């Protein structure tokens, strides 16, 4: 890096929130907190056993709001980057928590949904929802008697705000991936899209991802250590411009 950046796109995955105590989906055995993905993260699972699915996300929602779950140094550094950079910072996250927002980031795209929101199964109306969702709980905002569900993108469903994401990737002059495995598409392909439009690319991870060869620069270690260091470097270049 030797010149200031004006359009930075940051992709974050489970690795950035793991340091804050958020348990992650284990792709190698298809389990999420000892539940089969087919049972708790698919439309079919919800149709088959809505009580199980609601209970699963209710527990995750309660955990997220526990006072012990806080944004870590990586989240805070990205919030500082957005506040201080003479340019635009877009955070695209695969995570369903609100730690980026609590860390100070405002321009956040949740491509997999948000745990603290609920959605009407019929109208797709989305509302803020910090309490448990009960089976049989109807939509509060429309007249259609339809079950409320977590505002989460399940396997087999379309990711959210993809048009905005690809527009941001086209404009990016720096693309940073933090805490991602590089095995879940379309997110795993974002580095290639950004490179095609001329962005410098950096990977920050505990270990090389499945797409590490796409990155021009690699930094391996804890996100809470590596992200603040990178942000300091970017802002130092910015002040010299």
Swiss-Prot record:
Keyword Cytoplasm: yes
InterPro entries, alphabetized: DHS-like_NAD/FAD-binding_dom, NAD-dep_sirtuin_deacylases, Sirtuin, Sirtuin_cat_small_dom_sf, Sirtuin_class_III, Ssirtuin_cat_dom
EC numbers for this chain: 2.3.1.286
Positions of substrate binding: 57, 60
GO cellular component: cytoplasm; host cell cytosol; host cell nucleus
Pfam families hit by this protein: SIR2 (PF02146)
EC main group: transferase
Chain positions recorded as NAD(+) binding sites: 13-32, 94-97, 179-181, 205-207, 223
Keywords associated with the record: Cytoplasm, Host cytoplasm, Host nucleus, Metal-binding, NAD, Transferase, Zinc
Cofactor: record remark: Binds 1 zinc ion per subunit.
MF terms in GO: histone deacetylase activity, NAD-dependent; NAD+ binding; protein-malonyllysine demalonylase activity; protein-succinyllysine desuccinylase activity; zinc ion binding
Catalytic activity: N(6)-acetyl-L-lysyl-[protein] + NAD(+) + H2O = 2''-O-acetyl-ADP-D-ribose + nicotinamide + L-lysyl-[protein]; N(6)-succinyl-L-lysyl-[protein] + NAD(+) + H2O = 2''-O-succinyl-ADP-D-ribose + nicotinamide + L-lysyl-[protein]
Keyword hit for Cytoplasm: yes
UniProt similarity note: Belongs to the sirtuin family. Class III subfamily.
Subunit structure comment from the entry: Monomer.
Domain notes: The NAD(+) binding region 13-32 is crucial for deacetylase activity. 2 residues (Tyr-57 and Arg-60) present in a large hydrophobic pocket are probably involved in substrate specificity. They are important for desuccinylation activity, but dispensable for deacetylation activity.
Protein name: NAD-dependent protein deacylase
Gene: cobB
């Amino acid at each position: 890096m030797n010149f200031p950046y004006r359009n930075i796109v940051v992709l974050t995955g489970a690795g950035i929130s793991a340091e804050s105590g958020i348990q992650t989906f284990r792709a190698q055995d298809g389990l999420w907190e000892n539940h089969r993905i087919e049972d708790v993260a698919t439309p079919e699972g919800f149709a088959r056993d809505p009580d199980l699915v609601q209970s699963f996300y209710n527990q995750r929602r309660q955990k997220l709001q526990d006072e012990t779950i806080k944004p870590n140094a990586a989240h805070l550094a990205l919030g500082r980057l957005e506040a201080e950079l003479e340019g635009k910072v877009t955070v695209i996250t695969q995570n369903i928590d609100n730690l980026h927002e609590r860390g100070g980031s405002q321009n956040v795209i949740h491509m997999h949904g948000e745990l603290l929101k609920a959605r009407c199964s019929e109208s797709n109306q989305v509302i803020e929802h910090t309490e448990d969702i009960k089976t049989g709980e109807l939509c509060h905002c429309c007249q259609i008697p339809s079950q409320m569900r977590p505002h989460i993108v399940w396997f087999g469903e379309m990711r959210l705000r993809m048009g905005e994401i690809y527009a941001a990737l086209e404009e990016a002059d720096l693309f940073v991936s933090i805490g991602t495995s590089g095995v879940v598409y379309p997110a795993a392909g974002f580095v290639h899209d950004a490179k095609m439009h001329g962005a410098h690319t950096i990977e920050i991870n505990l270990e090389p991802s499945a797409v590490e060869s796409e990155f021009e620069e690699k930094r391996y270690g804890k996100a809470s250590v590596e992200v603040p260091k990178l942000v300091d470097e970017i802002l130092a270049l910015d002040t010299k411009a």
